[in-house]
């Protein structure tokens, strides 16, 4: 059917695009490590994404529609791949800004397209719109989530040609790897000093750029245009909702529960930023070589996807508090272990155990924090999730921003401190909810007693 065809086209378009971007993101701290250029570009991306989320999507979608917004935004992502061919401050930072400004319209247009398609199909078939939209999003994420596997697999297969079997054996000094890695120091004799050849880097970037171009062609040629309903296009409608959205996002901070959740939301950005920006460079690249970054991140992506599905179901039986505690304990244990561990190539399996545990914990942070926002702020979901995106993105910006100035050990202590603050503040939120539910229950019982008393008096 036409609707499913369009959903599949959008899904595979995003798969192709994020196969390229996801792979590049994992490699930035290792591939463009000079003066911290790689992580600086990632910080700029998320900073631009914050600004873009507030100002750009409604205007662009209104002007050119969902389909062509997706196409134009995908072209913004391709510029980042092109900028990596001649990586410098004059190429990567501008292309990072372009990507960041294109990111918010891309996701907004995708969500609008899938939602509108689901609503129209439900109307036509007389079904519940909510059920159809959920099915469409489920299909999309089923396909999209595998991009983390393919992008990293491609990079490891290509860069693996640069490292003959047994090439690690001649390196013995790894004292500067792991928590001991500091700005301005080299990796000693670790394998991280061996960079892939230019020809291999260009091959990888060529594959990634080609993947992005294929995504654009797929959407531009095969995706059907969907016209937004007339009431959505009336003059002033978007501008009004746009200004209201900004005010609602700011006003939502008056809710003390939202303020208490800021550290937890920012921690999501901190922990993801550490794994992709610091673990990949200071542990994996330094000790094993850049060709293993992809394999390690595949382990994270696969565990994350499986656990996201698992914990989404498990939360019905355990409740969210137990899962949050599990994630906090897992992350805290990993951070402490990373502070103490001296990474050597002989500890090969350990390099994969950390991202596997991290992926499990991240699955809890993502699924349960989103669910928590949905439950706590049921009547103000749009403002709540706007705050969620804002504070998580800010966490990314800070994590990538200080990456080039601090030792890994300091970054691990910061991560642990933010985690502890986040969990304590989250505990206050749960306490407030418990008190609120207790009051509501007492009020209900009191009303029932008054009602029974009134009935008895009437009977007399």
From Swiss-Prot:
Its cellular-component GO annotations read: membrane
Q: Locate the transmembrane regions by residue number.
A: 7-27, 41-61, 68-88, 89-109, 139-159, 203-223, 292-312, 321-341, 345-365, 390-410, 412-432
- Report which residue ranges the record marks as coiled coil: none
| Record-linked SUPFAM superfamilies | MFS general substrate transporter
Membrane topology of this protein: Multi-pass membrane protein
Provide the protein's localization: Membrane
Keyword presence, Transmembrane helix: yes
What UniProt keywords apply to this chain's record, in alphabetical order?
Glycoprotein, Membrane, Transmembrane, Transmembrane helix
Q: Which residues are glycosylated?
A: 168, 189
User: Which Pfam families would you find in this protein's record?
Assistant: UNC-93 (PF05978)
Q: Which Gene3D superfamilies match?
A: MFS general substrate transporter like domains (1.20.1250.20)
The family classification in the record reads: Belongs to the unc-93 family.
**UniProt-recorded name of the protein:** Protein unc-93 homolog A
Q: Which organism is it from?
A: Xenopus laevis
């Amino acid at each position: 059917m036409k609707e499913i065809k369009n959903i599949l086209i959008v899904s595979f378009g995003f798969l192709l695009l994020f196969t390229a971007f996801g792979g590049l993101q994992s490699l930035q701290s290792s591939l463009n490590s000079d003066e911290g250029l790689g992580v600086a570009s990632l910080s700029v991306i998320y900073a631009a994404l914050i600004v873009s989320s507030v100002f750009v999507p409604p205007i662009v979608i209104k002007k050119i529609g969902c389909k062509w917004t997706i196409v134009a935004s995908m072209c913004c992502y391709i510029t980042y791949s092109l900028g990596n061919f001649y990586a410098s401050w004059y190429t990567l930072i501008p292309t990072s800004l372009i990507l960041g400004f294109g990111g918010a319209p891309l996701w907004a247009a995708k969500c609008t397209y899938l939602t509108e398609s689901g609503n129209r199909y439900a109307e036509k078939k007389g079904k519940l719109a909510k059920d159809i939209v959920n099915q469409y999003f489920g299909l999309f994420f089923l396909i999209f989530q595998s991009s983390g596997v393919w992008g990293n697999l491609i990079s490891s297969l290509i860069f693996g040609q640069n490292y003959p079997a047994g090439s690690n054996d001649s390196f013995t000094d790894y004292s500067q790897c792991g928590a001991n890695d500091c700005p301005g120091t080299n990796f000693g004799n670790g394998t991280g000093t061996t960079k892939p050849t230019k020809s291999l880097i260009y091959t990888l970037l060529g594959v990634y750029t080609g993947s992005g171009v294929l995504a654009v062609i797929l959407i531009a040629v095969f995706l059907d245009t969907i016209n937004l309903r007339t009431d959505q296009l009336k003059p002033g409608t978007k501008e009004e909702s746009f200004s209201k959205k900004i005010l609602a996002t700011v006003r939502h901070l008056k809710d003390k529960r939202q303020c208490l959740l800021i550290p937890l939301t920012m921690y999501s950005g901190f922990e993801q930023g550490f794994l992709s920006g610091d673990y990949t460079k200071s542990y994996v690249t330094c000790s094993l070589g850049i060709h293993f970054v992809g394999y390690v991140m595949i382990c994270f992506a696969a565990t994350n996807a499986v656990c996201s599905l698992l914990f989404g179901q498990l939360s019905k039986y355990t409740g969210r508090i137990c899962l949050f505690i599990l994630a906090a304990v897992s992350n805290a244990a990993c951070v402490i272990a990373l502070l103490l561990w001296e990474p050597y190539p002989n500890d090969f399996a350990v390099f994969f155990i950390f991202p596997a545990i991290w992926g499990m914990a991240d699955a809890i942070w993502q699924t349960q924090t989103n669910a928590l926002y949905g439950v706590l702020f049921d009547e103000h979901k749009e403002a709540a999730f706007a705050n969620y995106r804002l504070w998580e993105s800010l966490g990314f910006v800070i994590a990538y921003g200080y990456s080039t100035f601090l030792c890994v050990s300091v970054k691990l202590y910061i991560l642990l401190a933010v985690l502890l603050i986040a969990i304590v503040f989250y505990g206050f939120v749960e306490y407030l909810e418990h008190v609120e539910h207790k009051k509501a229950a007492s009020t209900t019982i009191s009303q029932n007693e008054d009602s029974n008393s009134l009935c008895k008096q009437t009977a007399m």
